[in-house]
Amino acid sequence: PQMFGLRGQAVHRAASGWSPVYVQQVAADPQTGGEGEDVELGVMSVGFMTPSDDDALIWRGPRKNGLIKQFLADVDWGELDFLLVDTPPGTSDEHISLVQLLGKTLGPDDGAVIVSTPQEVAMLDVRKELSFCVKTKLRVLGVVENMAGLTVPVTGLGFRDGTGNDATEQAISMIRERCPELLSLSACLDIFPPANGGAQAMAESFGVPFIGRVPIEPALARACEAGLRALPGSSDVMAPIVERILRQ
């Protein structure tokens, strides 16, 4: 709910089933890059059902599985173009239930998108998820590497001196005076250096497509905090990834 700007909303039960909470968004025109048609996105989350955002759900497997079944069978989704299910990390009851409940309805274009960060400690778990997909015969549409580096304009960097005090203003002034062309560049940092080839090598070892990398994007994080798809004027770092997934 937070990422869609839907905190405080509630689901309602009608004769046809639960009604999802809808958010109106404007899709980008793939030809011009400008605004296209309005799209209606239905959202269903257990977050709509708790008395408080801070409440924990202390449920065992059978109860969680029952709720997943209700979300799939008892929600009046209407006619869908896509059904996206965001699952927790790992291979748990939720994943098994989803595969069992959706298994017979999955077509040749359906499957899982696996997301990993480039560190080995993360990929250890993600390899288990890929193995799960192989054993359950769930198609893997591809692997995405998240948090793949950070790009910051030089003018957006902070600087400190040897004692830890802020020296940003002095550093920028020195650059402007001695090498002003640097101010038009960006600094690229590998916050989490890829281990053993990162997610791309992992995808290749399992014989599944590597979709691409998503950098650490502060503007995207701020957009999620504000419940927006993207902040006005910021680049849409997810657009290339979405396009590649749709082509799978």
Question: How would you label these PLM feature ranges?
Answer:
Residues 1-50, 65, 192, 200:
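Phosphate-binding loop that captures ATP/GTP phosphates
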Residues 9, 49-51, 89-91, 118-122, ...:
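Conserved nucleotide-binding/hydrolysis micro-motifs of P-loop NTPases
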Residues 9-17, 46-63, 67-97:
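Switch II (G3) loop of P-loop NTPases
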Residues 18-23, 97, 116-118, 128, ...:
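Structural and coupling elements of P-loop NTPases
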Residues 44, 68, 86, 126, ...:
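Residue-level signature of catalytic and energy-coupling elements of molecular machines
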Residues 61-69, 92-95, 120-127, 193-200, ...:
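Amphipathic alpha-helical transducer elements in NTP-driven molecular machines
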Residues 78-92, 107-130:
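Conserved Switch II/interswitch segment of TRAFAC-class P-loop GTPases
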Residues 130-248:
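C-terminal lobe/tail of nucleotide-utilizing enzymes
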